Swiss-Prot record:
Keywords: Plasmid. CDD domains: ParB_Srx_like_nuclease. This is Uncharacterized protein y4yB. The lineage of its organism: Bacteria, Pseudomonadati, Pseudomonadota, Alphaproteobacteria, Hyphomicrobiales.
Amino acid sequence: MRCERASVRPDRMEHCLLSAAQLIPTEEVNPDRVDALKAQILQAGSWTAPITAEKDALFVIDDYHRLTVAHRLRLTRMPVVLLDNDSVRVESWRPGGNITPAEIFAMARSGRKFPYKTTRHVFAHGLPTCDVPLELLSSPTPMEIAPVFSAGAL
């Protein structure tokens, strides 16, 4: 796996740039949400929130909608925070539902996906924001990116 490290503030998590093709989605998305998010990202002209992915298996932990947008925009790379899935609390959005990290790993290996809004990940610390121009993410040559932190992500 090639991970182009991005320079970030030392008090924040670090994100890197990975090919969207390397990341494995494990949950379906809401097409209307994808369309709305794509419009927001195009209007902003930059990527403002890294996707989170499991550091070894590269399955998406959170933000399947952004991954879908990256594919639709044919981005060659995207900001990703790599995490150990055991360091993230996993819950179910569904009342009475229970989901475990082992089930998510199994789904990633199977190539199938959970239904939309099955998994909910709770992060102990906030995730970083970034401000990466879309033209840098669609460029065919690797580049180092120094993100600019914003108050919130789109």
